[in-house]
Amino acid sequence: MSYEKLKVFIEENFSDKNLVIVSNREPYVHKKIGANIKTENPAGGLSVSMDEVLKAVGGTWVAWGSGSSDRESVDRKNCVRVPPNDPRYTLKRVWLNSNEIDNYYHGYSNQVLWPLCHIALDKVYFKKKYWHDYKKANYVFAKAVLEEADEKSIVWIHDYHLCLVPKMLRNRRPGLVLAHFWHIPWPDYSIFRICPQSKEIIEALLNNDLLGFQLPLFIENFIHCVKESFEDADIDYQTSTITHTPELHTTSTITHT
């Protein structure tokens, strides 16, 4: 499904629901240029495509505030309306300290998950503090989502930076509709099991109602990981759905084409 078709699909089916997008990177950054504050759009397919969706249907985008003037540009709820020249939706920023940035982002996300999923095993580097701050940062994102989401919200989480957010949200608000798109490869179980927290990550992702991958192969790999990690998981291979007990939550997996 192209992003243009996705936009139409959301407009037609979810116009009465509050859409909350969650990602590490934000779609608009405020920077100090001399005595002025300038708004910039970071490059990237996710930022561009999801920005168009939210401009069309409204909602909230939760992301890490990384700009030098981001704090100056938000209200007391850490929110700012965007785009600046024609506000259509709310950008809610979360704040991370330097240790969290180093360990959650540069550490666990980019020295563990990214190389592991790309099977660059010589670049995988584990540290306990990476995982500790990865969990802390995911909690910060989840808390921000809960401040904005209501019972009719659809929460759309993006990528490997936020693996634990689905479970955190499900535990606090079971009725939320949760979707998660994984923007990098998902390796076979023989590779992913190298990760010391592999089972915890898979279990967290199974709290989504919908889990998207780039290719059918990545769905097969993920399902293999579930099968090997959770003997009680009920897997329907024809529909690519997984029911995980004891919660009996069903996750559907899809590919992006």
Protein language model regions, located:
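Catalytic cores of carbohydrate-active enzymes across secretory and cytosolic contexts
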Residues: 1-257
